[in-house]
Amino acid sequence: MTMEAWDILVIGDGPAALRSAAVSAKNGAKTLLISSKALGDGGTAALEGLAAPIHEMNNRGHREDTIKSGYFLCDQDIVTTKTNMAIDEMNHLEKAGVVFSRDAKGLPMTKKGIGHSSSRIVDAGDASVRDVQQVLEEQCMKNGVVRRGDQLPIMLVSTKQKVDGVITLDMINGRFVAIQTKAVILADGGFEGIFNGTDIGYGMDLALQSGIPLRDMEFISKTPFGVTDSKLTLSSNMLGYGANLCDTSGNSISADNLVELCEAISQSSGAVIDGREMGDDKVWWQSAFR
């Protein structure tokens, strides 16, 4: 077993992990980021782009839509904080290099997403995941973050409710590594990947083993745009660009929120995305429509 010492250890390699690591290193912390998968596989966290009320006076509408779509079960303080930060996060990504789709005035183009009463979804078409991942990786490199892939977190080491470090398995070299650290950031996503063999929530497992209680485990993230018999997920933002969702008979499928849309699709004979009416906006989805 080898031993190392770092100021901050970040577990994960998606947008949340990369952003946390970059900011930590920028503020002077010696930062290590590890992922149980190969580096660059940030998952689909950025698939739907970002909801930012850039054409609204405040975040009130965004906040209310989020709470309503969550059937009033969301932590409303967290919703308020997140919707307040949305525009700043969009500005950060844009300044860092994400090329959002633009309108005729040259501003980020906003589309109306499922569950939103106003147009506030900004994205880069089917390049959203790639662009966000690439830009945040560049921020990590710029600030000196050390990143390692294929590192399986085994155990969180703590003493009297104080984190001391993490034991990991280096799957490249086949050895255990003891990492001493002042703080651990768990940002490797949830456990929803257990249904298709992708992300299974190693960070949540570490927390649970250490006696940290997990909240809201009954809420499971779900998308109605998964492709049958594959791990491919399409973005619902295509509907905002003019695509139509139909069943196999050509009848339109619609709903007020994602939960109802999932139910409508499951009750149909099958779902088809028709992109023939997208016009010039189809250029943003060249990978989805070939």
Give residue ranges: language-model regions.
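N-terminal Rossmann-like FAD-binding beta1-loop-alpha1 element of flavoenzymes
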Residues: 8-33
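Residue-level detector of alpha-helix initiation sites
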Residues: 14-15, 38, 191-192
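Glycine-rich FAD pyrophosphate-binding loop
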Residues: 26-47
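An anion/pyrophosphate-binding glycine-rich loop and adjacent beta-alpha core
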Residues: 39, 212-290
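A short alpha-helix-loop-beta-strand transition element characteristic
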Residues: 44-45, 73-80, 90-107, 213-216, ...
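Glycine-rich active-site loop/strand segments that organize a redox cofactor
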Residues: 52-82
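Conserved redox-cofactor binding core of oxidoreductases
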Residues: 92-175, 180, 187, 226-238, ...
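Glycine-rich loop(s) and the adjacent beta-strand/alpha-helix scaffold that form part
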Residues: 183-232
